[in-house]
Regions:
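Internal maturation/activation junctions in enzymes
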Residues: 302-408, 420-421, 436-437, 443-445, ...
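Extended C-terminal subregions enriched in glycine
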Residues: 456, 498-551
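Active-site rim segments in enzyme catalytic domains, especially the processed small/beta chain
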Residues: 71-104, 254-256, 400-469, 499, ...
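Bacterial N-terminal signal peptides
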Residues: 9-22
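Active-site Gly/Thr loop motif
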Residues: 254-276, 354-384, 425-466
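Noncatalytic scaffold domains of N-terminal-nucleophile
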Residues: 26-46, 50, 58-59, 63-230, ...
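Short, well-structured alpha-helical segments that form the helix of a local strand-helix-strand
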Residues: 59-66, 161-172, 242-246, 310-330, ...
Length: 585
C-alpha cells in the first residue's frame, strides 16, 4: 500500500485546498495495486482488507465490512437494519455484470396503515411511535442480504464463517473507542437510556465509555458465533430469531418469528445512464436515488459545466435548478415497485428529461411552486430516510466492485437492543407514511403511495453507484444523508467527470443541496464565498443555513477510482468523518 502523492492535472484542485477550511482539506488517496476497502471506520476497513488478503473477492470483503461496522459503528452499521448492495462482477465478459441486492427492511405482517396514529388523530410521539421503541422496527434484512451476496457472488475461497470472524473477534476481544464514538454515545444517551439493554451495552449503565477505552460486546459476539456455527438462517429461524420474537412479544412490539422466517431479499436490475461518454450504474426503486441521479445528469449534459467555473454562482444556480426538477418528480412518482407502478422508462426518457429544463433561465430561479411534476399528477410524495446511514466502497484485484449503503434509519435506530443478542434494532417504519398529509421530519408532505402495508419496503434515498468507461469501473461512490444522499453522489461524480478532480479532492469538495421543497439551497458552512451567495440571491435563489440537526457537513462519500492506464486503485476517505480509513494492498 502506497500513499505517494500524484500530480494534479488541473489548477482547480489546488484552488480548492486554498478555499476550504482545514477540516475539509483532502487527505492523500491511498494507492493500491490489488484491492481497497474504504469506510467511515478504520476497524471495518481493516476487516474487509483481511478477507481480501485471504483470497476473498470484493463481495466477500464487503460482507465482512458490513458485519464489522455493526460492532464498531453502531450509529448506523448493523445486522438489525437493511440496505442496498450494488455489485459489479468483472467476469470476463466485455462489460462485466452489474446487479443489485435489495435487503431493505419490510413492514411486519401485523403492521397497519394507521398504527402510529393516536386517538386524537395525531401521530404518537416517543415510545410506541414510528421512531422510538419496540413498535418502530421493520423486519431486518442485513444478514439475509449479506448471506445471499456472499453465497451467490462471493469467491468461493472463503466461507461464511470466515467473513463473520472479524466482526465476532471485534465484539469478543473489543475495540478502542474513538473520540467521535464516545461523543456520539453521550449525544444519543437520551434515546439509548430509555431501554435497559441499550443503557447497559452502549452507556455502561450511565458511566459512559471514554475515548481509548476497550469496548467488549459479549452478547453480540455470541450472536456472531451462532451465525458462524449454524449459518445465516440462524438469525431468522434459530436462537437469535427466538430471542428477537420473544422480546418483541414481551414489550408489545410488532415483529414475530413468522415475520423473520418469511423475510425475502430481492435481486433487482440496475439502472443505467450516460453522461459525457461515461456510463452511470445505480439503484432502481425502491430507491428514489437512481432515477433522480440519472435525471439530473440528463438535464446537465447540454451545459458546459466546466466552463462555468468550479465554485461559481453560475454552476451552483444550474445545479439547484436541476436538483429542483428531479426532486419534484421524485416527490410525485416514486414508491415500492412491488406495490405501485413506477414510470421508470418515462422518467428517464431522454426527450422527457431534456424537456424538464425548457423553462430554465441562467439569470432567474424558478420558484418551486412553479415546477410541476412532468408526467402529470400522481402524488406518491415519498419521504426520505434519516441521515444516519453509512456507505462503503470495495474493489478487488480482479476488478470486482461493491458499492453498499445500509442503515438503521435514525442514529442508533429505535434505541432498542434485543436482550441476549447485542442486536440494535432499526426504526425503519418511520420511512413509511405514518399519517397521509402530515409532514415528515424533513418537512415533506407524505402521500398514500408510501403508506404502511405488510411486506412493503419503504422508499429510500440511498444511491450506491458506479461510473464505468468501456465497461470498466472508473469510480465507486455513495453516501449517507437522507435526501442529501442523491445530491452528494451527484456532485462527487460531477467533480470527477466535469472537473477532472482526483478522488480525494472530489470527495472533500464543498457540497450544496436543493430538494424542491423547502425552496432553498443549503451549503456546508464556510465553503462558499459571500460574493457567490450574493450572486445567487440576485438570481432569486433562497439560501438557508444547515440546521443543528443536519450538522455543518453534508454526507460522507468514501470512494474509489481506478486509473485505466495503470490499473492502480485510489481510495479516498471523506474528511467529514474522523474515524474513516482506506485500507488497501
Amino acid at each position: 500500500m502506497k500513499t505517494t502523492p500524484r500530480p494534479v492535472g488541473v489548477l482547480l484542485a489546488a484552488a480548492l485546498l486554498l478555499v476550504a477550511p482545514p477540516f475539509l482539506c483532502a487527505q492523500r488517496a491511498i494507492e493500491a495495486e490489488h484491492g481497497l476497502v474504504v469506510t467511515c471506520n478504520s476497524y471495518a476497513s481493516d476487516a474487509g482488507l483481511e478477507i481480501l488478503r485471504k483470497g476473498g473477492n470484493a463481495v466477500d470483503a464487503a460482507v465482512a465490512t458490513g458485519l464489522a461496522l455493526t460492532v464498531t459503528y453502531p450509529f448506523a452499521g448493523n445486522i438489525g437494519g437493511g440496505g442496498f448492495m450494488l455489485i459489479h462482477l468483472a467476469d470476463g465478459s466485455p462489460d462485466g455484470r452489474d446487479l443489485v441486492i435489495d435487503y431493505r427492511e419490510t413492514a411486519p405482517a401485523g403492521a397497519s396503515k394507521d398504527m402510529y396514529v393516536g386517538p386524537d388523530g395525531k401521530l404518537i410521539q416517543g415510545p410506541g411511535s414510528s421512531t422510538v421503541g419496540w413498535k418502530a422496527s421493520g423486519i431486518p434484512g442485513s444478514v439475509a442480504g449479506f448471506a445471499l451476496a456472499q453465497q451467490k457472488y462471493g469467491s468461493g475461497k472463503v466461507t461464511w464463517a470466515d467473513v463473520v470472524e472479524p466482526a465476532r473477534r471485534l465484539a469478543a476481544e473489543g475495540h478502542l473507542v474513538s473520540q467521535w464514538t464516545a461523543a456520539s454515545l453521550k449525544q444519543w444517551a437520551k434515546l439509548l437510556g430509555q431501554f435497559d439493554e441499550s443503557k447497559k451495552i452502549f452507556l455502561k449503565n450511565g458511566s459512559f465509555y471514554a475515548a481509548g477505552e476497550n469496548w467488549v460486546q459479549p452478547d453480540l459476539a455470541a450472536t456472531f458465533a451462532r451465525l458462524q456455527k449454524h449459518g445465516p438462517r440462524e438469525f431468522y429461524e434459530g436462537e437469535t430469531a427466538r430471542l428477537i420474537a420473544d422480546a418483541m412479544a414481551q414489550h408489545g412490539g410488532n415483529l414475530t418469528l413468522a415475520d423473520l422466517k418469511n423475510y425475502k431479499v430481492a435481486e433487482r436490475a440496475v439502472l443505467r445512464g450516460k453522461y459525457r461518454g461515461y456510463e452511470i450504474v445505480t439503484m432502481p426503486p425502491p430507491s428514489s436515488g437512481g432515477i433522480a441521479l440519472l435525471q439530473m445528469f440528463g438535464m446537465l449534459e447540454p451545459f458546459d459545466v466546466a466552463a462555468m467555473g468550479y465554485n461559481s454562482a453560475a454552476k451552483y444556480h444550474l445545479f439547484a435548478e436541476v436538483m429542483k426538477r428531479a426532486f419534484r418528480d421524485r416527490a410525485e412518482y416514486l414508491g415500492d415497485p412491488d406495490f405501485i407502478k413506477v414510470p421508470v422508462a418515462q422518467l428517464l426518457d431522454p426527450a422527457y428529461v431534456k424537456g424538464r429544463m425548457a423553462d430554465y433561465s441562467p439569470d432567474h430561479a424558478t420558484p418551486a411552486a412553479a415546477v410541476p411534476p412532468g408526467l402529470g399528477k400522481f402524488v406518491a410524495a415519498a419521504p426520505p430516510e434519516s441521515k444516519e446511514t453509512t456507505h462503503f466502497s470495495v474493489i478487488d484485484a480482479a476488478g470486482n466492485a461493491v458499492s453498499n449503503t445500509y442503515t438503521l434509519n435514525g442514529a442508533y435506530g429505535s434505541g432498542v437492543t434485543i436482550p441476549g443478542t447485542g442486536v440494535l434494532m432499526n426504526n425503519e417504519m418511520d420511512d413509511f407514511t405514518s399519517l397521509v398529509g402530515a409532514p415528515n421530519m424533513f418537512g415533506l408532505i407524505q402521500g398514500e403511495a408510501n403508506a404502511i402495508v405488510p411486506g412493503k419496503r419503504p422508499l429510500s434515498s440511498m444511491t450506491p453507484s458506479f461510473v464505468l468507461r468501456d465497461g470498466k469501473i472508473v469510480l465507486i461512490t455513495g453516501s449517507p444523508g437522507g435526501p442529501t444522499i442523491i445530491n452528494t453522489v451527484f456532485q462527487v461524480i460531477s467533480n470527477v467527470i466535469d472537473f477532472n478532480l482526483p478522488v480525494e479532492q472530489a470527495v472533500a469538495a464543498p457540497r450544496m443541496h436543493q430538494q424542491w421543497m423547502p425552496d432553498s439551497i443549503t451549503f456546508e458552512r464556510y465553503n462558499v464565498s459571500p460574493d457567490t451567495i450574493a450572486l445567487l440571491k440576485a438570481k432569486g435563489q433562497n439560501i438557508r443555513e444547515r440546521t443543528s440537526y443536519e450538522g455543518w457537513s453534508q454526507g460522507d462519500a468514501p470512494s474509489i477510482t481506478l486509473d485505466p492506464k495503470t490499473g492502480l486503485r485510489f481510495g479516498a476517505t471523506d474528511p467529514r468523518r474522523p474515524d474513516a480509513k482506506a485500507s488497501g494492498y
